[in-house]
Each structure stands twice: as structure tokens, then as C-alpha cells.
Amino acid sequence: MSVAVVIPARGGSKGIPRKNMRLMNGKPLIAYAIGNALASRYVDKVLVSSDSEEVLAFASQYDNVLALGRESRLAQDAVTLDPVVYDAISRCEADGLFDVVVTLQPTSPLLSVETLDAALEYFLSSELDTLISVVNNPHLSWMEDSSGRVFPAYEKRLNRQQLPRHYVETGAFLVSRRECVTPAGRLGNSVGVFEVPEAESTDIDTRKDWVVCESLLDRRSIVFRVDGHRQLGIGHAFRALTLAYS
């Protein structure tokens, strides 16, 4: 089955100016999504859709990435990703339709290619129409109706560990059968979720999110080597373990 990835990357961002091209731990944020798409074992085509000349110029530096200029009507704040993804994919199907379309957000730099490939492998072996990246985040939550009345979004008050699974979309990726991708949506009748590791789930929306992601990407590994024997004892080994896990 042929798989195409669409990376939607607007030039404007109210929360973080030039977010997609701002350096995240030494390289533009969008580079992480492009890198994952190119490294995937299942992806055949990588498309970057943007209204920004800067983003398009950067994406064009990659040999196997097609940079597509986005019309201004598709770059407005109120426009959802559905028509954007449809526009990008439909412009690249002169030689035939793709079987699967993956929307890969540039705002999830912690996502690993191993997780992406695991999700694609799961989807391709299933009968699902759509697969959405999620994290399990059970909490006692409340909702509000149109009249302003609040009501619980749970049936029974329980400890967090006893609550039913509650999936929250991470925004990292959304995988769809090609026939489900239209200007009005990307969800089919059969929708599944793929739980990503908590450490890969951050979606950059605020400056705080940015700082968190950058600090995690900038972490350095420290190797502890501890030698011990019967005469020397192993007390120092336990102290080293305390340091390693502190």
C-alpha cells in the first residue's frame, strides 16, 4: 500500500512567532517531523504544505520532500486541517491515488520514528479507516453546556487509578484511508487510537511547551560504572544507584 505523509506548517503563529522554523535544540522545529517521515519504513511520499516562503525553501532542501505552497484562503486561523490535507494530497496524485494519508504535525518533536512506524504497522494490518495518536489521561473532569451549567463527565467518583481509560489526542499524527480524506474531514466510520509514550506526547502550543520539549531533547546521558568485590563491599554500588535514579 502506498503511504503519503502531509506535514502542515503555517508560517504564522500567535503564541510563538515563526514557530515551525524556530530552532529547537539546534534545528528548525519542522525538521523533526520531516526527519521522521523520511526515516519511516512505510512512507512513500512526503509533502509539506505551507503559506510561508521560509518553510517552503527549507523543505525544498530535502531531496525526497515536495514543498507545496498553500493558498491564503487555507492559511487562515479558522481553517481546519481537513481542507489543507485534502488540497495537498489531491495535487500530487496525477499518477494515481495514494492508499493511506498520514497527517504529521511539526509541533510534536519528541515523537520517535519507532513509534510512528509502530502505529503505521498497526494501521496497515487492520481494517480501520482512521487511527489517531493519543495518551491515556484519566481524570475527574467536568463539562459545560450552552446554558453555562456544569456537569460531571464521569459516572462515578473514583481514585484516578480506578477510572476508566480516557484517551486524549496528542496531535502528533492522524492516519486515514485515502477515501476518508475530503475537504470536510479525515475520519472514517471505523476509528481507532494508538497510545504513544507519555515522553513523546507533548504538542507545542505555548512557550512553556517549547521549554519542556527543548529541555528533554537537550538531555545528556550519564554512564555510571561501579566496580565491587567481596573485599571492597557493595555499599558504594547502592549509593551510585541512588545518584543514578535521583
Predicted features, each with a name:
Residues A4-R10, R220-R230:
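Nucleotide-activated donor-dependent transferases that construct or modify glycoconjugates
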Residues V3-S49:
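N-terminal glycine-rich phosphate-binding loop and ensuing alpha1 helix
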Residues E53-V100, L110-E114, A118:
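Short phosphate-binding loop-to-helix
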Residues P83, D87, S108-P197:
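Conserved core of the sugar-phosphate nucleotidyltransferase
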